[in-house]
Swiss-Prot record:
One of its GO terms (molecular function) is ATP binding. It is found in: Cell inner membrane. One of its GO terms (cellular component) is ATP-binding cassette (ABC) transporter complex. Part of the ABC transporter complex PotABCD involved in spermidine/putrescine import. Responsible for energy coupling to the transport system. ATP binds at residues 50-57. Residues 18-248 form the ABC transporter domain. It catalyses: ATP + H2O + polyamine-[polyamine-binding protein]Side 1 = ADP + phosphate + polyamineSide 2 + [polyamine-binding protein]Side 1. The gene is potA. The keyword Translocase applies. Keywords: ATP-binding, Cell inner membrane, Cell membrane, Membrane, Nucleotide-binding, Translocase, Transport. The lineage of its organism: Bacteria, Pseudomonadati, Pseudomonadota, Gammaproteobacteria, Enterobacterales. This is Spermidine/putrescine import ATP-binding protein PotA. SMART domains: AAA. Its main location: membrane. Belongs to the ABC transporter superfamily. Spermidine/putrescine importer (TC 3.A.1.11.1) family.
Length: 378
């Protein structure tokens, strides 16, 4: 988002494991994936993120071999697997429902895949024990699924998937059935397990916080196409368009109009009716409409108690929400636009707990803003 928040974009020297090239897929005449290209690297935790119906689960099912492509190719470890049956792909999937066999013990559930592959009997017990030890369920080996918590069942499903030593593990919304506290715990455990195993994980979710917490890389999808592909920080701090900006966390969008270019980096603009300097790294014209994007935590607010010269936008506190570590305020600008501001709680600041209807000045550190061309006026 600019100078002091500039991201370190060293090239990632990872080797590709999966290549999707020109993938298209339709159901009942409706195209759900359109000419999609995606590289998944060895050993990374990649998340496919997007709203319901964006095509993320279809991509997962195409990689797994549970659906067939209409066009394009899928490569795994330099082998074309586009038409290889699912059972021969060295890819395992953990579904939202876990689908454990209720009549089998935990041990038997994990061993099932090995027996189906006709693994020598002498290998089965040590491999199952190793897999259960990895997910910290060794002592639960003789229990039935109904005797386990939701989080434990989820770990059994993962152990069953990794015991076959897949090159790739696919997880389809596999934490969504858990309660909030257990989800948070499982996010940390899943990421730690992925690091320990060194297996490539591809995780599908619509939960932005989950994606930011767990991923090495996030692929944001909408209507069957990739909107942005980057690290969690890149996606959060440097969104490429308004959809990504609005989908990942809270963000304020300000309307701006170019007044003049000041230098190579900065433009003088009218932002919601107030003149400000903004950082714009693309060519603009006089009078051009822009979008200025700022996260609530990137805004600074100051109470106005006199008529001294005021920098920034002017508004009035309309709502306050105490969130423990932060105080979130809704400020109404003079033109009626509502702005969200998030401040870290500071009980030693006498002006911190703002009164309703208090007049405020809103500003930000120059260059922390993201500026995008107005998509409606290109």
């Amino acid at each position: 988002m600019g100078q002091s928040k500039k991201l370190n974009k060293q090239p990632r020297s990872l080797s590709p494991l999966v290549l999707l090239s020109g993938i298209s897929k339709s159901f009942d005449g409706k195209e759900v994936i359109s000419q999609l290209d995606l590289t998944i690297n060895n050993g990374e935790f990649l998340t496919l993120l997007g709203p319901s119906g964006c095509g993320k689960t279809t991509v997962l099912r195409l990689i797994a071999g549970l659906e067939t492509v209409d066009a394009g190719h899928i490569m795994l470890d330099n082998q074309d697997i586009t038409h290889v049956p699912a059972e021969n792909r060295y890819v395992n999937t953990v579904f939202q429902s876990y689908a454990l066999f209720p009549h089998m013990t935990v041990f038997e559930n994990v061993a099932f895949g090995l027996r189906m592959q006709k693994t020598p009997a002498a290998e089965i017990a040590p491999r199952v024990t190793d897999a259960l030890r990895m997910v910290q369920l060794e002592e639960f080996a003789q229990r039935k699924p109904h005797q386990l918590s939701g989080g434990q069942q989820q770990r059994v499903a993962i152990a069953r998937a990794v015991v076959n030593k897949p090159r790739l593990l696919l997880l389809d919304e596999s934490l969504s059935a858990l309660d909030y506290k257990l989800r948070k715990q499982m996010q940390n455990e899943l990421k730690a397990l992925q690091r320990k195993l060194g297996i490539t994980f591809v995780f599908v979710t619509h939960d932005q916080e989950e994606a930011l917490t767990m991923s090495d890389r996030i692929v944001v999808m909408r209507n069957g196409v990739i909107e942005q592909d980057g690290t969690p920080r890149e996606i959060y701090e440097e969104p490429k368009n308004l959809f990504v900006a609005g989908f990942i966390g809270e963000i304020n969008r300000f309307d701006a109009t170019v007044i003049e270019r000041l230098d190579e980096q900065r433009v003088r603009a009218s932002v919601e009716g107030r003149e400000c300097n903004i950082y714009v790294n693309f060519a603009v014209e006089l009078g051009q409409k822009l979008n200025v994007l700022l996260r609530p935590e990137d805004l600074r607010v100051e109470e106005i108690n006199d008529d001294n010269h005021i920098e920034g936008l002017i508004g009035y506190v309309r709502e306050r929400n105490y969130k423990g570590m932060t105080l979130e305020s809704v400020v109404e600008l003079e033109n009626g636009k509502m702005v969200m501001v998030s401040e870290f709680f500071n009980e030693d600041d006498p002006d911190f707990d703002h009164s309703l209807d208090q007049k405020m000045a809103i500003s930000w550190v120059e260059s922390w803003e993201v500026v995008l061309a107005d998509e409606e006026h290109k």
